[in-house]
Swiss-Prot record:
<keyword id="KW-0234">DNA repair</keyword>
<dbReference type="InterPro" id="IPR013876">
    <property type="entry name" value="TFIIH_BTF_p62_N"/>
</dbReference>
<comment type="function">
    <text>Component of the general transcription and DNA repair factor IIH (TFIIH) core complex, which is involved in general and transcription-coupled nucleotide excision repair (NER) of damaged DNA and, when complexed to CAK, in RNA transcription by RNA polymerase II. In NER, TFIIH acts by opening DNA around the lesion to allow the excision of the damaged oligonucleotide and its replacement by a new DNA fragment. In transcription, TFIIH has an essential role in transcription initiation.</text>
</comment>
<dbReference type="GO" id="GO:0006289">
    <property type="term" value="P:nucleotide-excision repair"/>
</dbReference>
<dbReference type="GO" id="GO:0005675">
    <property type="term" value="C:transcription factor TFIIH holo complex"/>
</dbReference>
<dbReference type="GO" id="GO:0006366">
    <property type="term" value="P:transcription by RNA polymerase II"/>
</dbReference>
<keyword id="KW-0832">Ubl conjugation</keyword>
<dbReference type="GO" id="GO:0009755">
    <property type="term" value="P:hormone-mediated signaling pathway"/>
</dbReference>
<dbReference type="GO" id="GO:0005654">
    <property type="term" value="C:nucleoplasm"/>
</dbReference>
<dbReference type="Pfam" id="PF08567">
    <property type="entry name" value="PH_TFIIH"/>
</dbReference>
<dbReference type="GO" id="GO:0006360">
    <property type="term" value="P:transcription by RNA polymerase I"/>
</dbReference>
<comment type="similarity">
    <text>Belongs to the TFB1 family.</text>
</comment>
<dbReference type="InterPro" id="IPR011993">
    <property type="entry name" value="PH-like_dom_sf"/>
</dbReference>
<feature type="domain" description="BSD 1">
    <location>
        <begin position="99"/>
        <end position="154"/>
    </location>
</feature>
<comment type="subunit">
    <text>Component of the 7-subunit TFIIH core complex composed of XPB/ERCC3, XPD/ERCC2, GTF2H1, GTF2H2, GTF2H3, GTF2H4 and GTF2H5, which is active in NER. The core complex associates with the 3-subunit CDK-activating kinase (CAK) module composed of CCNH/cyclin H, CDK7 and MNAT1 to form the 10-subunit holoenzyme (holo-TFIIH) active in transcription. Interacts with PUF60.</text>
</comment>
<feature type="domain" description="BSD 2">
    <location>
        <begin position="180"/>
        <end position="232"/>
    </location>
</feature>
<dbReference type="InterPro" id="IPR005607">
    <property type="entry name" value="BSD_dom"/>
</dbReference>
Length: 548
């Protein structure tokens, strides 16, 4: 069943699969089906593996949903609850419409990353052909740690991924087109929906409240485009309008933004106006009565207000994550000039803002010394000094001087006796062994391997070494075998090594044998494989002894 860490988004009971009743589970990363009365899933598909979904036409006796996988397989689910079958099927369909595009982009991104790695690395591409195309190992096993290593390298170069901003004209991309039946069809993509949600949190809140409980996703966006919330003229909103409350929330938010003002003195344009110090000591700026009435009645003011609010929301959508990170720091610096500090108008803060604008870090003097932090995995080993294995006797300086004088006297009186160093028989046998044709000069007359072996054989041998090295790297990484996953992997890697030996190594041996090459070119590869087999045999023997 679902693990404790998995979030279950939707559960639909009375769903048949191959004439067997069960329940359908939609989780954060996969969809699964469990038979009735059992506590395990018999069908489970990751969203990234699903290509598309299909539903049965209206009027059919069976209310069905079909999942089409990238591999070409299909899975059918029959909603058998007569009273709510259509509603439950549509709820599953709408939820899948939201989830599948996210994982589809992720799958496409992984595929692009794999293609990029294969194009940039010819050795990796050849390794892929030798192991995956020849079916020595599966593609999942080949990419298991390749993508992880590449992700680790990329994360080390950049600690965080740059977020994609929001275009100020994203609503202009929603180009209405006539459908030929006195209707309009809007080009609404998942990116535009995400931009709407990030820019207008009130719409996202309405979406969560109504979809799919009160209406379908199609009905929601139809009412969104029909609403005055989407159009420029927002002076009059209907009482039954779903988005009337959103307009009020926007109006309130805009007033809050205006009341906060711009805290950065360098960006505050209103501070450039001359204000007489009359009543209120210059802090009360009340517009004239004649002018305020005309502004309310002017429809152009609503359009300008809408544009200002839209620009502010687009900027705020990109700065929400930055402000959340800045809350953890002591001195946040916001790009729009607004600061969360209440004491922003204090002289010290004002000086800090001015200093930040006129000083450059790269022009200042940096006297700090860069240090490298020591990462101790086992710090307790460094708490005590080294302990000697056995007791040592230290010599004094006088003992060292006396030893030096003694060695010096012996060297001055040394007389070489070369006839006693090596016997004549040993010297004669050594000369014979080092002569041409001797025991130690067997390879002296042989040609180099690059002159004896053709270039195509050399290239194929290099590919074999790279392939067997990759397989052995996976094999030896399983030791010490201390988890069930490693136990399963080491046995699987042994079968992969045997398959490689049969499909790649043996045909190569037969090929060089047909070309009458006397040099055993694959002896070292066979030795490496045999060492791996011996290691696995030793581990299995110890495992059996522990069980008995």
């Amino acid at each position: 069943m679902a693990t404790s860490s998995e979030e279950v988004l939707l559960i639909v009971k009375k769903v048949r699969q191959k004439k067997q009743d069960g329940a359908l589970y939609l989780m954060a990363e996969r969809i699964a089906w469990a038979p009735e009365g059992k506590d395990r899933f018999t069908i489970s598909h990751m969203y990234a593996d699903i290509k598309c979904q299909k539903i049965s036409p209206e009027g059919k006796a069976k209310i069905q949903l079909q999942l089409v996988l990238h591999a070409g397989d299909t899975t059918n689910f029959h909603f058998s609850n007569e009273s709510t079958a259509v509603k439950e099927r549509d709820a599953v369909k709408d939820l899948l419409q939201q989830l599948l595009p996210k994982f589809k982009r992720k799958a496409n991104k992984e595929l692009e990353e794999k293609n990029r790695m294969l194009q940039e690395d010819p050795v990796l591409f050849q390794l892929y052909k030798d192991l995956v195309v020849s079916q020595v190992i599966s593609a999942e096993e080949f990419w298991a740690n390749r993508l992880n290593v590449n992700a680790t390298d990329s994360s080390s170069t950049s600690n965080h991924k740059q977020d994609v901003g929001i275009s100020a004209a994203f609503l202009a991309d929603v180009r209405p087109q006539t459908d030929g039946c006195n209707g309009l069809r809007y080009n609404l993509t998942s990116d535009i929906i995400e931009s709407i949600f990030r820019t207008y949190p009130a719409v996202k809140m309405k979406y969560a409240e109504n979809v799919p409980h009160n209406m379908t996703e199609k009905e929601f966006w139809t009412r969104f485009f029909q609403s005055h919330y989407f159009h420029r003229d927002r002076l009059n909103t209907g009482s039954k309008d779903l988005f009337a409350e959103c307009a009020k929330i926007d109006e309130k938010g805009l007033k809050t933004m205006v009341s906060l003002g711009v805290k950065n003195p360098l960006l505050d344009l209103t501070a450039l106006e001359d204000k007489p110090l009359d009543e209120g000591y210059g802090i009360s700026s009340v517009p004239s009565a004649s002018n305020s009435k005309s502004i309310k009645e002017n429809s152009n003011a609503a359009i300008i207000k809408r544009f200002n609010h839209h620009s502010a929301m687009v900027l705020a959508a990109g700065l929400r994550k930055q402000e959340a990170q800045n809350e953890q720091t002591s001195e946040p610096s916001n790009m729009d000039g607004n600061s969360g500090d209440a004491d922003c108008f204090q002289p010290a803060v004002k000086r800090a803002k001015l200093q930040e604008s006129i000083e450059y870090e790269d022009l200042g003097k940096n006297n700090s010394v860069k240090t490298i932090a020591l990462n101790l995995k086992k710090s307790d080993r460094y708490y005590h000094g080294p302990t000697p294995i056995q007791s040592l006797q230290y010599a004094t300086s006088q003992d060292i001087i006396n030893s030096f004088q003694s060695i010096r006297q012996e060297m001055e009186a040394y007389t070489p006796k070369l006839t006693q160093v090596l016997s004549s028989s040993a010297a004669s046998s050594t000369i014979t062994a080092l002569s041409p044709g001797g025991a130690l000069m067997q390879g002296g007359t042989q040609q180099a391997i690059n002159q004896m072996v053709p270039n195509d054989i050399q290239s194929e041998l290099k590919h074999l070494y790279v392939a067997v090295g990759e397989l052995l790297r996976h094999f030896w990484s399983c030791f010490p075998v201390n988890t069930p996953f490693l136990e399963e992997k080491v046995v699987k890697m042994k079968s992969n090594l045997e398959r490689f030996q049969v499909t790649k190594l043996c045909p190569f041996q037969e090929k060089i044998r047909r070309q009458y090459l006397s040099t055993n070119l694959v002896s070292h590869i066979e030795e490496m494989l045999q060492t791996a087999y011996n290691k696995l045999h030793t581990w299995q023997s110890r495992r059996l002894m522990k069980k008995t």
